[in-house]
A protein has these predicted regions:
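Short, solvent-exposed loop/linker segments at the N-terminal edge
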Residues: 246, 250-258
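Proline/serine/threonine-rich low-complexity linkers at boundaries of modular beta-sandwich domains
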Residues: 222-243
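Residue-level signature of extracellular beta-strand-rich folds
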Residues: 246, 260-265, 276
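Extracellular acidic, Ser/Thr/Pro-rich low-complexity tracts
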Residues: 252, 263-268
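Extracellular acidic loop/turn motifs
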Residues: 231, 266-273, 281-284
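Fold-level signature of zinc-dependent metallopeptidase catalytic domains
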Residues: 1-132
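The catalytic-center signature of Zn2+-dependent metalloproteases
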Residues: 72-95, 135-212, 277, 281-287
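Exoplasmic/lumenal beta-rich domain surfaces
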Residues: 70, 275-318
């Protein structure tokens, strides 16, 4: 075969935050005594840490799919300052069930839409408890994130935003370890967006940490799920969906570098950014691209920018 044909999925066909509705969900964030101790052991210091994490997450969620997370007013009821008396075990083995029971008892089921636990037990540990369970009683409060240094931008984005992404219906986008069967694994190796595993897959790492945005396929999953549930408070933003054209499909000889140029417009006058992403799902036989790959993912995602063109590969590598 002396040609390579790639058909890029038009962004016009991907479900996104296109209905001009901002969705605000009530989130309950509990913390273990270990997390509280790491952050100084007082309500004021712990609340400041939670606020910083929530600010970083909301910056991404509001930009990518017009979703905002608002801390419940009674959240202090699930902040525990003493590891010896908190309702959580010494390991994360039963965090999912312990958190769900704690939130339903202390916050009450009707008073929150999504719940998450922050802990400082172990290293790089997290589990959403479910895929797509916001607003679902009995499951919505079962996600947790734990790390022995539970602080900083990478903790917030690589770990907490990743697990909350699962709670909102997103699956993994990495391809480093086979196929999960959801047809959304579209990033080489570890991946570099939030639903990947950047920095923790060894030889297939694309980079050390996740970039602060979701892959288009994750945006599609989360947007679809958000539109299917009804517990959010909604606000009509009046924003108009931008127009975009990624250009015609191309058929190229194997190994040929190429350039893609897109065009976009926005009648509201908003500044547009562009992000080119390959939409070929992993087929379980590929984990990392090579010059001999005949299927799977060849190109990684890069941070959105105002530049409407991209070279494949990057000019600096040719």
């Amino acid at each position: 075969n002396n040609s390579l044909e790639k058909t890029f999925k038009s962004s016009l066909n991907i479900k996104d935050a296109d209905d001009s509705i901002k969705r605000t969900y009530k989130i309950a964030i509990s913390v273990t005594g270990e997390y509280a101790a790491y952050h100084g052991g007082t309500f004021a210091l712990v609340n400041a840490a939670i606020a910083k994490t929530l600010t970083n997450i909301n910056a991404v969620f509001e930009n990518d799919f017009n979703v905002s997370l608002q801390l419940v007013s009674t959240n202090d009821a699930v902040i525990y300052l003493d590891a010896g008396t908190d309702p959580y075990g010494d390991t994360s083995n039963n965090y999912n069930n312990e958190l769900q029971a704690t939130l339903d008892t202390e916050i009450l089921e009707a008073n929150y839409d999504i719940g998450h636990l922050l802990s400082a037990v172990g290293s790089v540990d997290g589990n959403a408890g479910c895929i797509g369970c916001v607003c679902v009683n009995g499951l919505k409060g079962s996600g947790y994130t734990s790390d022995n240094t539970p602080d900083g931008f990478n903790f917030d984005i690589d770990l907490v935003a990743h697990e909350i992404g699962h709670q909102f219906g997103a699956n993994h986008t990495w391809t480093h370890n086979g196929n999960e069967g959801e047809n959304v694994q579209m990033e080489p190796g570890s991946g570099s967006t939030i639903m990947g595993y950047a920095g923790i897959t060894g030889s297939t790492n694309v980079q050390a940490n996740s970039d602060p945005y979701f892959h288009a396929i994750s945006i599609e999953q989360i947007t679809t799920y958000s539109k299917s549930i009804s517990c959010a408070s909604t606000t009509n933003t009046g924003n108009t969906t931008p127009t975009v054209n990624a250009g015609s499909n191309l058929t190229l000889p194997i190994g040929t570098p190429f350039k893609l140029v897109g065009t976009g417009g926005d009648i509201d006058g908003d500044i547009l950014t562009y992000c080119w992403e390959q939409a070929d799902e992993n087929d379980a036989s590929t984990t990392f691209p090579s010059t001999n790959s005949t299927s799977g993912v060849s190109f990684r995602s890069f941070n959105p920018s105002t530049d409407n063109k991209r070279y494949f590969p990057r000019l600096s590598t040719i």
